[in-house]
Amino acid sequence: MASIIMTGRILCIKPLQSVVKSLRYATTASFSRTADAPEKKVAVIGTGVSGISALKNLTSPFGNIKPVAFERSASFGGHWSFTSNKTRDEFGYPPSSAIYCGLRTNLPRELMSFPGFEHDDNLPTFPKQSDIYEYLQRYVDYCDLEKYIKFNTIVTNAVPRSPGDAKTKWEVTYCDVSDPTKSSTEEFDAVIICNGNCVFPNVPPFPGIDAFQGRLLHSRDYRQAEEFKGQNVAVVGSSYSGKDVARQLSDFADKVYLTHIDEPIKTVYENGNVIEKNFGIREIKESSIVLENGKEVHLDAIVMCTGYKYQFPFLSEDIISIQNEHVTPLYKHVLHLDYNSLFVITLLRNVATYPISFNQARFARSVIDGTANLPSKAEMAEDIAREVKWRSENNMTGPMWHYMDTLQWNYDSHLADMGKFEPLSEMLQIYWNFVENHREKDFCNYWKYDYVMNGKKTIEAIKRDEHQEEEHLPYRLVV
């Protein structure tokens, strides 16, 4: 595959054979259908990775769609738009970003890019936060997307004009964050929700949690490990964020207690001051926690790495229901069962967010412009019921309702088949499987390697020169 470097942009140029393959999904009939159709106005709520994906697909030259994106903050990028602010901005809203200083990706750059727009080959396999944000900036500039975004604007309400009508239009009410008393309402043919899945922290109601006199925070408010120098800190939760925060704190804290209820982790923490406690928390006291095995651990601080909750404050509960972190009723986790004009591109966990959200947006676009081949409502309801049954039988409920991992590839193929576009490359799946295995075996060091794919569809991990990169940098977490 060839590439062209132009003013810092990497534009992927596909071979003719690949182009021909792509064109079989884009027939002359579909082009003419969208070109002749009346203009449709689509609201996009949020401009993180998913919102940028939506804007790119909605602005295809083959069609008459006018997108309007609403972004609460002053910049696009969501998580990747770093801010040192930990709690609230000047208008009382939480920051869009949960990223901390010096952060790196925990996925290779091949899984952190949009189709057809690659990262600079000079970057390490696991880039820094600043590299990722610069990539998003180049992409938005190259695709000329910023002109569609209303910054510092919050959506307060989205209601169907004709409740129960699958093709209803929507009334979207919004206001400037600086003056919520003055609002405006516009009508849209469709709404695509991209408000993120790492915005609203989940803090379990442990008995006695309000009695703790030390520092208690969620990982979303965590910024610098240096703040905990010489302290005894409990990190609650052992998913990506829990293990990473424990690793970073180990450079500064006296002792780090990694408490969780999962299987013992395989990672070896090099500093020797990370103490794993795979027991649940029975009680939190003024200066300690009591584990389920009865052991009491005295602490200065607690960092809750306990995930996030889904929330859609601009929708009524009769439109979107959230029960035990299961967002319903959605077909394929993206299309509302009752409204073919309402989409959610923000739910999936443990996926390659960039390419997956891009193809979710392509699917939404195909439904909006009428090129998608959708099942009947009854068939979609049956599909939802089958998946609920399967996930219930396989212990994938609660925070796992929208969890994908290796399921994401078949999921993407189904969307591509219905939307009549090309599914994601097999190469991405190879990268995914490799990094998942590498990360599990060596969580503290895997980011120090560069990945090189050879002609046999296998990947070689090559250790980077330690003098090329700063040591002990944290990396991006998929939650």
Predicted feature locations:
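C-terminal, flexible cofactor-proximal segment of oxidoreductases
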Residues: 341-479
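Glycine-rich FAD pyrophosphate-binding loop
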Residues: 59-86, 257-264
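N-terminal Rossmann-like FAD-binding beta1-loop-alpha1 element of flavoenzymes
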Residues: 39-68, 245-246
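A Rossmann-like FAD-binding core segment of flavoenzymes
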Residues: 153, 157, 165, 169, ...
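Short hydrophobic core segments
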Residues: 45, 186-198, 234-236, 299-307
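Glycine-rich active-site loop/strand segments that organize a redox cofactor
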Residues: 72-138, 331-337, 382-401, 405
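Feature captures the FAD/FMN-dependent oxidoreductase FAD-binding
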Residues: 118, 122-190, 195, 199
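Glycine-rich dinucleotide-binding loop and its adjacent helix/turn
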Residues: 122, 128-135, 141, 184, ...
